[in-house]
Amino acid sequence: MKSTVAAVKNPTGKVQADVCKPFTGKLFYLDLTSKLISEKLEKDIKELGGAIEGFLSKEISYLITSKKEAKCVKTLKYVCSIPSPEAAPNTGESSTSPGNRRLCQEGNSSKKNEKSLVSRGKSLVKRAIKEQEILPKNSILSNALNWGVKILHVEEAKHYIEKKKTALQQVRKSQPVVKVESKPQTRRKVKPQKLKSPYIKVEDCSCQYRPLYLVLPQFRSFQNPVSNYSVEVDKKADPGQKLPETKQSVNKTGHGQDGANNPNIKLKEQKKHGYCECCLKKYDDLESHILSPQHKNFSESAYYQVVDDLISTFDFDFVDWSKYKNGRKGVGILMLAEKSKTEGQERNEANLFVSKTHNFSERVTATTPLQENTLKDQHASPCSLPCTPACNADQMFSLPSPAGSARLCNKKYKMDSNFGQLVATPLPSFNLKDSLTGSFGGREMFVAKLNETMEPATEGPKIKWDVCNIPSNISQCIPQKVDPIAQHVNQFPNGNTHCSEMTACQAALIYENVDSAADANIKLPKTVNDLHNKEGHRATDKIYPTVQSHEYLPDYSPSGNLHRKVKTSAHRNKNKDELFCRLSHKVSVPQQEDDSKFPSETLLALFESSEDKTEFFGFAGSPAYESCSMDDGDTPDQTHKKMLLSLFPHTTTSGSSFLGF
C-alpha cells in the first residue's frame, strides 16, 4: 500500500505512467455489429493507452463482442473443458459404452464387429450431444476460448472503461499543475533560389514574413503610360479569367502590378507555328518563314512553268466585266476578225469602221477588203453618196483584233482640200468566187477607231441612208433612173470615184472582179418585216460579251458571227427619218420592179425596219450559206443576188438580246 501511494506521488515514476495509461501494452479485438459503438470504444481504448488489432490471434489480450454467448463465460469454459466425443474414433475407444473396452482387448476383429454392431439408439445419442454444443466449431468465440483470450461483452467493456477513466481523472486532479514554457518557433529553412533579372523583390526587415518577388521578361518603364512588354496582349482572352497560380505570390496579393494593365488579361505570344509543305519543314513564325530565302527560291523557281505555259495558251485575257454594266447601248455592224492562216504577214490598211449607235438610231456601215487593182478596174468604179447629218462622229467602239491590227487603229484618212472628198485607199484583195461558199475565207476585217480630230464632212444633199461606193454592177442591174444625188459625185480622170469626207457612220461596200456579164436587172427584195418570226429552226452561234471600253483588248480574241434582233419599245418615240439596219440574207418576198423609184430608195428597202418604234438588238439570219454558192448554171439575176447576200457574215437568230463579243 505504501509503495502504491509513493508511486502515485512520484510523477516521474513508471507507476504514474501506468495510472495515466492503464491499457498500455494491451491488444483489443472488437467483434461488434454497430459501427458507432465500435468507433467510440476504439477512441477510449486509445486514450487509455490500448491498441486495436484487426485480426484475431493468440496475442490478443481482450475480445470485446456483442454476442449473447459472451455473457456466460464461465459456463463456456466448463463446456469446453469436457473432452469431445469425437475423440473416441481417434483412440479406437468409446467413452459411452464400457463394453467397447472389452472389445478393444480382443483384437482388431472385435473392433470391426463393434462398428458394425452400433445400434440406432447410440447414433441418436451422438447426434444429441452434437446439437447440445453451444459454440460452433471454428468460430471466433470457440477459438478465443481455446487460445486463452479473455472474452468481454460490450456492456461489460463499457463499464470497465468508464471505471478506468474516472480513476484517471482523480489522479490528474491530485497532481500539481506544472507550467511548460513555450519555446520560440524556429525559423523554417527555405532553400535559396536565384532570381533572373529583371525582377522586383519586396522583403520584410524583421524577416517574419516571406519576401514577395516578381520576375519580368522586360523591365517596365514608369514614364510611359503603356507597358513595354515584348509580348502582345491576346485580345480574345477573357478579361475575367484569372492567371494560373504560380509560385510568385504577387499574383495573389496584387503587389507590384502596374495600374495601367489589367492583371487578369492573359499574355500570349503572337506566333503561328506550322508546317510548310513547299519547303517540307516546320516553322515557328509564319511571317519570318515567308520572307526566308528558302521559301522565296521555291516560289520563284521553275516549278510553276507548266502552269504558266497552260495559261499562255488561253484565247482570252482575264477582264473584269463588272466595269461594263450598261448593256442597253447598241453597236453597229460588228464583224469579228478571223485569224489569218499565214502568221507573220503584215495586214496593211484594212479597216472596218463601226459606229456607236446613240439610242439605237445611228447609221451603220461596213467595209470589206479591196484588191489593190480594184480601183483601177473600169467595171468597179463605184458611185459616191454623201452621208446624212443624222450620223454621229462619236468615238468608235473598240473590239479585240488579230495581231497586227493595232497599227491600223486611230488612223486618219488623207483629205483633199479642193474637193472635200475622201480618197479610197487600196486594201488587201480576196477572191469573191472562192469565198461565197458560206464564208469570206481568208478575208480579214478589223475594227478601227475614228480619230476624234477628223475634220467635219462637207455638207451635201441629205438622204436617209448611208451606203456609199456601191459597185457599178449593182447600179447597172437597177432600173436606170436619173438620181439627183449622183450629179454631185466628182470623178477623176483615172475613173476612180471618191466620196465626200466620211464620218463615223460611213463606209464602203466594195467588190472584186465582178462579172461584166451581169448586166441584167436584179430583183431586190422587199422590206423585211417578218424575219424574226422564223427564228425557231435556226442554230445559235456563239456570242461573245461586248466590252464597252475605249481601250483596245489583246489581239488574240476569237472570231465569230453576230445576230441582230429588233424589239418593240413603247416608251421611246423614234424619228421616222432614222433608219435601223436589219440585215439578213434570207428574204421572204422579192420586190417587183418599179421604174418610178430611185436606185437609192430600192437599196434603202434592205435596211428599212418593219416598225417605227423599235430597238436594235442584233442581227438575225440563217447559218446555212449553201444556197449562196454560185453555180455555173445560175442566171445573172441569181448571181448578183448571191453576191449581194454574201457580203454579210453568217448570222443566227436568237431569242436573247445582242450582248457583243
Swiss-Prot record:
Zn(2+) binds at residues 276, 279, 289, 295. Residues 246-264 have a biased composition (Polar residues). Residues 18-111, 136-161 form the BRCT domain. Forms a complex with cdc7. This is Protein DBF4 homolog A. It comes from Xenopus laevis (African clawed frog). Pfam families: zf-DBF. GO terms for cellular component: Dbf4-dependent protein kinase complex. Regulatory subunit for cdc7 which activates its kinase activity thereby playing a central role in DNA replication and cell proliferation. Not required during the initiation of DNA replication in egg and during early embryonic development but is required later and throughout development. The complex cdc7-dbf4a phosphorylates mcm2 subunit. The gene is dbf4. Its main location: nucleus. A zinc finger (DBF4-type) spans 269-317. One of its GO terms (molecular function) is protein serine/threonine kinase activator activity. Keywords: Cell cycle, Metal-binding, Nucleus, Phosphoprotein, Repeat, Zinc, Zinc-finger. PANTHER family: ACTIVATOR OF S-PHASE KINASE-RELATED, PROTEIN DBF4 HOMOLOG A.
